[in-house]
């Protein structure tokens, strides 16, 4: 069965309480349940991992026990060459996803180290963006088989 890693970066554990006007009111657990339901309908397995620590996210990627990934790098999107390098090194496709649209926010969020190595980016669509991203990565992984 196709296995998709949903990798959540720093501060995403605070969903539902951190700046809900930007990130919404759904908690990370609620978001993951929604993704699980959608994955069930697609016939794929999803695994979730969230960390506030860059090295832990990279270590999880290095496990390479998945066919593709959804990645919300949080603030690391704008700063982490190491995360980018790990994504390139593992040779697994991923879709970048963000609840908000970083390009329409503060100037420092205009830098994106991940977008050009992702197979697609889904931004600014709230929790529904994760479902769209899952559809995209499942289609992409299916076309590689």
Task: For every predicted segment, state its role.
Residues 1-4:
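Extreme N-terminal starter segment of soluble prokaryotic enzymes
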Residues 15-29:
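Glycine- and acidic-residue-enriched helix-capping/strand-helix junction motifs
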Residues 45-55:
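Short beta->alpha junction loops
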Residues 47, 95, 103-145:
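Short, glycine-/small-residue-rich phosphate/pyrophosphate-handling segment
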Residues 56-73:
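Short, electropositive alpha-helical surface patch
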Residues 64-66, 88-89, 111-116:
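Short, hinge-like loop/turn segments at secondary-structure boundaries
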Residues 68-103:
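Mid-chain, well-packed structural core segment of small domains
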